[in-house]
């Protein structure tokens, strides 16, 4: 058991354009080497393109895409009697949001490597794919669900 105290959650200030904490967290995920202005340009540009394509509000598109990608279940390793089981557990809200943001970022980055498009376009495409329940990020969520479903027999080993 650790003797250190649990680290307190940092309060993230909302982004300047849409006044959203979730969008500020997404900008933080995309940001590299402290270049916040570049990350903001990429995210805002992708949201503007998505808004122009669908004709809906940028924040409603972002929130819907995020809700479609957020996982409800995942598997955690639990060692019992010398055997390690993959135990399905429910995902807490904060972790679900963090996973969804990371998955959207990773899927857009993978698409960027495959094509010659700008990252802004790849991020826009990935947000629209997640909005329509398709794409790389949604596939990652479905893989989590398949793992949880396959190991449903071990759900009685849940964590306390």
Curated annotation (Swiss-Prot):
Keywords: Ribonucleoprotein, Ribosomal protein, RNA-binding, rRNA-binding, tRNA-binding. GO terms for molecular function: rRNA binding; structural constituent of ribosome; tRNA binding. One of its GO terms (cellular component) is small ribosomal subunit. It holds the Pfam family Ribosomal_S7. InterPro entries: Ribosomal_uS7, Ribosomal_uS7_bac/org-type, Ribosomal_uS7_dom, Ribosomal_uS7_dom_sf. One of its GO terms (biological process) is translation. The keyword RNA-binding applies. SUPFAM superfamilies: Ribosomal protein S7. Belongs to the universal ribosomal protein uS7 family. One of the primary rRNA binding proteins, it binds directly to 16S rRNA where it nucleates assembly of the head domain of the 30S subunit. Is located at the subunit interface close to the decoding center, probably blocks exit of the E-site tRNA. Part of the 30S ribosomal subunit. Contacts proteins S9 and S11. This is Small ribosomal subunit protein uS7.
